[in-house]
């Protein structure tokens, strides 16, 4: 019973699926049928009838026949074939050959897609042809108007076009011949070819119109403006030479000849209607003329600079030379009291030598100015370099003078430092006396003696004539380090001695109970009486820490508290 139910359900499912699938396939057939009908109803015949209104010869006739044949082939062959395939699909569905039917439907879809593209191509090409004819009629009239205006302008103002007039005539004649060619192509039905003529004529005419706009101005530049600039430049050049300017290095004569040759080349370019090349050439000529003007102006500015700066530079040099002489005398005087390093002496000799060289260079420039054979711009550059070196020498010379002045200041500072170190050493000795130590370690006495000797060496260095400040500074540094070490050790030694006493006093409470403490404290006392305070402290602390760990920290705190109260 259950099996029968399952079989019935399966059969029912198959029947439902079969029904739904067949319905879907028939819907696809209906869609393709509607598509086929829409293609057949496209207005191709109407579009082709518009073509018949044109001149049905030549290219137009050939295109019309091509389009008509394609349409006839679609209507008579390809679309009926589609219709037949649709019927075949229905028969396949009736026989439940769904896979085959689906393949045929895909084929029909592809055929209709191709047919749609062919129809659209026919319509687009027809529109292009008809549109070309309409555009041609409109644009050719505009071009004829432009042509007549250009012809009229060339005739009325021919003199303004000069050498280019003949070539412009030729260009306009070429355009006129294209108009005739356009008429012939249109009459023979070759509208697309005629369209190409319209486009090329439009480009040529626009180009000619632009040339006619530029040529008069370019000719004015070549025939009037630039020659006038060259004359003005040459007159200025001659006037400057008469005033004594040295201008041979600019080669103005040769430059002007070259510019005139370039003008002739530009005129030839204009005559050949190479307008862009002529524009570029004229621009280059004008830039080169501006450069020549700039060079002449540079000579004028340089002349003014020399005229105004020579006396100032001479005054600066003389002032520097006088200061150097004073510094030389000051150096000799300083050397009586201070010993200058070889490096410092070499530096000063170098400064003297360079100042002498600067004086010689200035004299040479003066002579060249009087000789009047060197361009002012070159002399100006040399003077600027000389001025920069004078400024540099002034700085170096000032640094050397400051160094001499610093020597005396350094001596005073060194004497002050010596006094400070003596006071510091005396303070250390006062602290020792105040502490009432039983005695001093041999190593400390030796260190103290060395510090005193080092202070004596500094004092001796400061009394030398001439005074060697480099040696003084070295002796000061060594002595300062020694005094500082003595002072630090003094403070440390006094603190250790005081702390030993505190530790022993604190540890006395354990003497009777702990023999080890008694023994350790006795050893510490022995070391203390022999002035070894550091070892005494270590011995006392070691003995005490065995019975009371952390005792040292507590004693140190007590020690610090007592010192704070005393202060």
Curated annotation (Swiss-Prot):
Subcellular location per the Swiss-Prot or TrEMBL entry: Cell membrane
Name of this protein: Septation ring formation regulator EzrA
Similarity section: Belongs to the EzrA family.
One GO BP: division septum assembly
InterPro entries with a match to the protein in the record: EzrA (IPR010379)
Cleavable signal peptide: none
Cellular component terms per the entry's GO annotation: plasma membrane; septin ring
Keyword Mitochondrion: no
Cytoplasmic side: 22-567
Gene name, Swiss-Prot/TrEMBL: ezrA
Domain of life per record: Bacteria
Role this protein plays: Negative regulator of FtsZ ring formation; modulates the frequency and position of FtsZ ring formation. Inhibits FtsZ ring formation at polar sites. Interacts either with FtsZ or with one of its binding partners to promote depolymerization.
Topological relation to the membrane, as annotated: Single-pass membrane protein
């Amino acid at each position: 019973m259950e099996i029968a139910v399952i079989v019935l359900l399966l059969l029912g499912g198959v029947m439902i699926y079969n029904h739904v699938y067949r319905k879907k396939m028939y819907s696809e057939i209906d869609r393709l049928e509607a598509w086929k009908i829409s293609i057949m109803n496209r207005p191709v015949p109407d579009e082709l009838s518009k073509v018949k209104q044109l001149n049905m010869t030549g290219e137009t006739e050939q295109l019309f026949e091509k389009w008509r044949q394609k349409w006839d082939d679609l209507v008579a062959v390809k679309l009926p074939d589609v219709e037949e395939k649709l019927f075949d699909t229905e028969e396949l569905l009736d026989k439940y050959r769904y896979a085959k039917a689906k393949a045929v439907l895909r084929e029909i879809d592809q055929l209709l897609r191709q047919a749609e593209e062919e129809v659209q191509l026919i319509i687009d090409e027809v529109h292009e042809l008809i549109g070309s004819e309409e555009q041609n009629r409109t644009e050719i009239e505009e071009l004829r108007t432009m042509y007549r205006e250009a012809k009229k302008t060339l005739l009325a103002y021919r003199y303004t076009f000069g050498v280019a007039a003949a070539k412009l005539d030729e260009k306009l004649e070429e355009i006129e011949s294209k108009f005739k060619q356009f008429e012939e192509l249109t009459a023979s039905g070759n509208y697309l070819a005629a369209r190409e003529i319209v486009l090329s004529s439009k480009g040529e005419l626009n180009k000619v119109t632009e040339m006619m706009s530029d040529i008069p101005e370019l000719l004015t530049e070549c025939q009037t403006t630039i020659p006038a600039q060259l004359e003005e430049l040459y007159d200025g050049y001659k006037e400057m030479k008469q005033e004594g300017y040295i201008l041979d290095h600019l080669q103005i004569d040769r430059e002007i000849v070259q510019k005139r040759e370039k003008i002739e080349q530009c005129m030839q370019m204009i005559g050949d209607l190479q307008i862009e090349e002529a524009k570029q050439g004229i621009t280059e000529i004008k830039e080169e003329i501006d450069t020549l003007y700039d060079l002449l102006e540079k000579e004028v500015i340089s002349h003014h600079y020399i005229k105004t700066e020579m006396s100032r530079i001479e005054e600066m040099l003389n002032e520097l030379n006088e200061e150097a002489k004073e510094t030389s005398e000051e150096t000799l005087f300083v050397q009586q009291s201070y010993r200058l390093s070889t490096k410092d002496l070499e530096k000063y000799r170098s400064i003297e030598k360079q100042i002498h060289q600067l004086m010689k260079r200035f004299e040479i420039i003066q002579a060249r100015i009087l000789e009047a054979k060197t361009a002012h711009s070159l002399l100006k550059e040399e003077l600027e370099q000389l001025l920069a070196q004078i400024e540099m020498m002034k700085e170096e010379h000032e640094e050397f003078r400051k160094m001499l002045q610093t020597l005396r200041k350094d001596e005073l500072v060194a004497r002050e430092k010596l006094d400070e170190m003596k006071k510091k050493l005396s303070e250390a000795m006062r602290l020792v006396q105040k502490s009432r130590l039983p005695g001093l370690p041999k190593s400390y006495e030796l260190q103290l003696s060395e510090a005193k000797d080092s202070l004596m060496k500094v004092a001796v260095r400061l009394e030398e004539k001439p005074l060697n400040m480099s040696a003084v500074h070295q002796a000061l540094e060594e002595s300062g380090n020694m005094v500082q070490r003595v002072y630090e050790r003094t403070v440390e030694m006094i603190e250790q001695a005081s702390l030993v006493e505190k530790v022993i006093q604190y540890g006395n409470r354990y003497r009777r109970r702990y023999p080890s403490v008694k023994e350790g404290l006795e050893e510490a006392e022995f070391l203390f009486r022999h002035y070894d305070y550091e070892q005494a402290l270590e011995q006392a602390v070691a003995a005490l820490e065995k019975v009371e760990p952390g005792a040292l920290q507590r004693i140190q705190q007590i020690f610090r508290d007592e010192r704070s109260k005393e202060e």
